[in-house]
Amino acid sequence: SSAASDVYKRQQYACLRNLYYKEGYRVEMLSSFEPQFRFFYKWWIQLFAESEGKDNKGVFPVAGEFSEELHSVGQFIQDGSPIMFETFLDVKKQNASLIVEPDEKEDYFDYLDGKDFWEINKAAYHATVAAHSKKLPCLTIEVDELDAYHFGQLFYFFQFACYLSCKIMGVNPFDQPGVEAYKKWMFEALGK
């Protein structure tokens, strides 16, 4: 992708976050069917919560580790309060292959025998986007593949987009008055 296209995507994401916020969506769920994003979610939550959550403003960031949490969280998304929008991370290139091996157990999962987990997760991803987008706004950010280079691009994408989102919202992304308040109370309690 070109540099101009990348800048446009960051700007578009930041603008859409603010548009959804103004429309009353107060929660953003970052979701993926890729287990390698587990610790990335924690970084993303800290980035947006600490940068944007001030002056009684901000979109509350949460993450959905699918398919693990799809049943429980999916129920809320489909039938619960319409408080969130969802951003999916979709990986385009498969890194490894893991085939579901047949076993002797009689269960309802025999139809998956011989299928690759990549194929299963892609089917679940497409079905989830189709279902969730009927209820709430859904965005997709494509990641070419899971390697150091593309993770670096993803980190930069969200850092720049977070800065833009904060500026649009009218908050300073570089201070943390709420964190300083609890640290003051904690230090007093511990005698520092």
Give the residues covered by each predicted segment.
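Short, small-residue-biased leader/transition segments that mark boundaries at the very start
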Residues: 1-8
